Amino acid sequence: MIALPKLSQLDQASSMRVWLATQPADMRCSFDRLAELAASVTGDDPLSGHLFLFRGRGGDRLKILYWDADGYALWYKRLEEGTFKLPKIEEGARSVQLRPSELAMMLDGIDLKSVKRSKRYRRKKD
């Protein structure tokens, strides 16, 4: 079975980004069309190794596209009940960047709009 990288691997890969397209995508789209969408809505390179998330119109389906060294990989999940809860999205935004932990929470059914973060030290990048 092929699976996404483990969350612990994602957390250690500080250069990996997780992008969520804010508008629903046609779930019939596959590798090439999703790669085009990833580039147009995020402005990021689909070959970068970052994760690009696309949800279906009903909110119960999610596709994650990423480049895996020698080709695209696509992960697809359909919920039997409920919907994926999205984070707060600014009006007009075409995509939003998530932390790997937020992706894990979203996949576990946690409503990202109601999550409260405690203040933590973050080293500023040069």
What kind of region is each of these model predictions?
Residues 1-126:
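Polybasic/polar functional segments that serve as interface/processing modules
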